[in-house]
């Protein structure tokens, strides 16, 4: 938008009154028509001062806003840095406790598993009674015919050991190695053809039944329980599972006459 600028030749008298009436009189009395010294039209740009003022204002607002942003960021940084100094939350403590309990449980399971699989045929032999003593102490007896090379015998060793520990006060447990020529007569007497061969004897030494090979644990448990209770018969008098043939015997001479292995 443009504006008109008038430049008037006014009297130099300092007492001239610039009222509308005097102005009208001035224009009329000067040769009967208004005189204009100059008329020029120019755009209405903003003055440099205005621009500078706005620039100063804008710069002031910008700097103020930037100061506010910097202030807020510094507050955030200080809050984050200060939060690092806070004590750990209770959740972390709980998670650590849960992790510790889990590790302990895993170690317990690992140790118990290792203990079970750590039981060997030598351990069973070491805890077994001599055959002659078992026949003379008036208790029922479980006789296991085994061999060190028998895979099924080794697999069943942990179960046999647990059952022995449970009933050892009421039932004798005897281990006879089929590779030992000392037990040739017993091999024939009990008809051992495969191992492991478990023979169940009453208090007088009479055989009530036998189970051979890999069978469910309950077969052995229920038969031993029947012997301990003094029952006239056992639940599984004849049962055969997967076994190792006694024909694979590695016969060796007896080195210790008292040995039952």
Swiss-Prot record:
Annotated GO MF terms: oxidoreductase activity, acting on a sulfur group of donors, disulfide as acceptor
Region (Disordered): 39-91
Record InterPro entries: Thioredoxin-like_sf (IPR036249), Thioredoxin_domain (IPR013766), TxlA/HCF164 (IPR044241)
Description of the deletion phenotype: High chlorophyll fluorescence and deficiency in the accumulation of the cytochrome b6f complex subunits.
Membrane topology of the entry: Peripheral membrane protein
GO cellular component terms, semicolon-separated: chloroplast; chloroplast thylakoid; chloroplast thylakoid membrane; plasma membrane; thylakoid lumen
Location in the cell: Plastid, Chloroplast thylakoid membrane
Catalytic residues (positions): 150 (nucleophile), 153 (nucleophile)
Thioredoxin domain residues: 101-229
Keyword Electron transport: yes
Biased composition annotated in UniProt, kind: Low complexity: 63-84
Principal place of residence: plastid
Gene3D superfamilies in alphabetical order: Glutaredoxin (3.40.30.10)
Keywords: Chloroplast, Disulfide bond, Electron transport, Membrane, Plastid, Redox-active center, Thylakoid, Transit peptide, Transport
Function: Thiol-disulfide oxidoreductase that participates in various redox reactions in the chloroplast. Mediates the reduction of PSI-N in the thylakoid lumen. May interact and probably reduce other target proteins of the thylakoid membrane, such as FTSH2, FTSH8, LHCB5, atpA, atpB, atpE, petA and petC. Involved in the biogenesis of the plastid cytochrome b6f complex. Reducing equivalents are provided by stromal M-type thioredoxins and probably transduced through the thylakoid membrane by CCDA. Possesses low insulin disulfide bonds reducing activity.
Subunit (UniProt): Interacts in vitro with LTO1.
Name of the protein in question: Thioredoxin-like protein HCF164, chloroplastic
Annotated source species: Arabidopsis thaliana (Mouse-ear cress)
Gene for this chain: HCF164
């Amino acid at each position: 938008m443009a504006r008109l600028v008038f430049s008037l030749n006014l009297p130099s008298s300092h007492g001239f009154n610039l009222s509308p009436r005097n102005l009208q009189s001035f224009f009329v009395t000067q040769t009967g028509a208004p005189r204009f010294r100059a008329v020029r039209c120019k755009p209405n740009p903003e003055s440099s001062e205005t621009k500078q003022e706005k620039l100063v204002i804008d710069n002031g607002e910008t700097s103020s806003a930037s100061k506010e942003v910097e202030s807020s960021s510094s507050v955030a940084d200080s809050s984050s840095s200060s939060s690092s100094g806070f004590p750990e939350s209770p959740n972390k403590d709980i998670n650590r406790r849960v992790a510790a309990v889990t590790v302990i449980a895993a170690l317990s399971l690992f140790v118990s598993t290792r203990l079970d699989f750590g039981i060997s045929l030598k351990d069973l032999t070491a805890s077994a009674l001599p055959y002659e003593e078992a026949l003379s102490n008036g208790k029922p007896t479980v006789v296991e015919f085994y061999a060190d090379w028998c895979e099924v015998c080794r697999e069943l060793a942990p179960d046999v050991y647990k059952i022995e520990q449970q009933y050892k006060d009421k039932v004798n447990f005897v281990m006879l190695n089929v590779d030992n020529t000392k037990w040739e007569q017993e091999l024939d007497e009990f008809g051992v053809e495969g191992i492991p061969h478990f023979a169940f004897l009453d208090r007088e030494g009479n055989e009530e039944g036998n189970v051979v090979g890999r069978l469910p644990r309950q077969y052995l448990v229920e038969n031993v329980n029947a012997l301990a209770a003094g029952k006239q018969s056992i639940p599984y008098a004849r049962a055969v599972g997967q076994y190792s043939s006694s024909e694979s015997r590695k016969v060796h001479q007896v080195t210790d006459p008292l040995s039952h292995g």
